[in-house]
Amino acid sequence: MVSLEKNDHLMLARQLPLKSVALILAGGRGTRLKDLTNKRAKPAVHFGGKFRIIDFALSNCINSGIRRMGVITQYQSHTLVQHIQRGWSFFNEEMNEFVDLLPAQQRMKGENWYRGTADAVTQNLDIIRRYKAEYVVILAGDHIYKQDYSRMLIDHVEKGARCTVACMPVPIEEASAFGVMAVDENDKIIEFVEKPANPPSMPNDPGKSLASMGIYVFDADYLYELLEEDDRDENSSHDFGKDLIPKITEAGLAYAHPFPLSCVQSDPDAEPYWRDVGTLEAYWKANLDLASVVPELDMYDRNWPIRTYNESLPPAKFVQDRSGSHGMTLNSLVSGGCVISGSVVVQSVLFSRVRVNSFCNIDSAVLLPEVWVGRSCRLRRCVIDRACVIPEGMVIGENAEEDARRFYRSEEGIVLVTREMLRKLGHKQER
């Protein structure tokens, strides 16, 4: 393990990102989000009033100084590709800055798509080698968080690791959804199990397990060697968590990086924020938290901006209708192009170009772009998919049986509404 002085840290914080390439795994379907991902990959799902989920990983890269990125796509990639082309095309290739789109190459005989997360990188190795990077940062494109990857790169170099895995404690009852590790006093990973049925607890905190976040830093040459070896293994599932990380752990070359060391927060005393918004309830809850008085995730931090594609839209408008009812909102996010006419919106998130007509009451709802709400509607504890036309007088979120019959209702009572569901009920979706 190498001990570095403060000046060395500052120098490495500038140099290491320039020697790195980030590969963002963005091909996931996100089946737990149900119909919300029928026509788009999970990283392309809208979030926070104006963003897409993948914007967080991409913004973290830029803010960390990494300006060479590859986005590995697969499932329903059109929306994702379109978003990146529109919103992330400002790089200067002459300065060796880029976002490369890497679709499934379908090079394997008898295989049409990526066989696992590691195979997604393997199939693009010929392209990735051309980047001539010293370090490769592997990221999931479907998580919400702010992280300075330069700090993780410094930790990787300082510990003399060949592979570094970002980790954080999670409640032991939730740990079965993650790779779980045990570490020694130097953060060397001494045991790693992917999604165990009975997760081991942390020695100093029996109620929690130390979970992998699916964020990795590799020495580039070591990663390429591992991937080629894994590709030849017929018994491998070609997955980082299931195959590569346990193998590296067994070789004694994997180290853990505690997420709090690189998590970017405005309040240093706040809990580190990282969310896998993979279920409808988690997605709904994370969106609504942004509308709270003091949200857990600070989206207003000028030092760590989250970038996205910005349409040229007029400001949101709140108007009084002809009956004298005022358009009002409280504890909500309302994006550009929205019009709220004579209705009340409380603790909700409205994406761009949403129109709410008179006499409506919207409470704890997430309305994706271009939703049109007819007069006298009541929407509560729901997610309304893009461009839905909610007919006049419709009530959602007040009758569990009725909601489950017409739409998708989660066990927690969150209702998902899509255009297809509304069409099946006989409601036209064209205006």
UniProtKB/Swiss-Prot annotation:
One protein family per Pfam: Hexapep_GlmU
SUPFAM superfamilies hit by this protein: Nucleotide-diphospho-sugar transferases, Trimeric LpxA-like enzymes
Source organism of this protein record: Escherichia coli O45:K1 (strain S88 / ExPEC)
Protein name: Glucose-1-phosphate adenylyltransferase
Record note on quaternary structure: Homotetramer.
Function, as annotated: Involved in the biosynthesis of ADP-glucose, a building block required for the elongation reactions to produce glycogen. Catalyzes the reaction between ATP and alpha-D-glucose 1-phosphate (G1P) to produce pyrophosphate and ADP-Glc.
Residues that, per the record, bind beta-D-fructose 1,6-bisphosphate: K39, R419, E420, M421, L422, R423, Q429, E430, R431
MF terms in GO: ATP binding; glucose-1-phosphate adenylyltransferase activity
Catalytically driven reaction(s): alpha-D-glucose 1-phosphate + ATP + H(+) = ADP-alpha-D-glucose + diphosphate
Site (Could play a key role in the communication between the regulatory and the substrate sites): Q74, W113
Binding site for alpha-D-glucose 1-phosphate: Y114, G179, E194, K195, S212
Gene: glgC
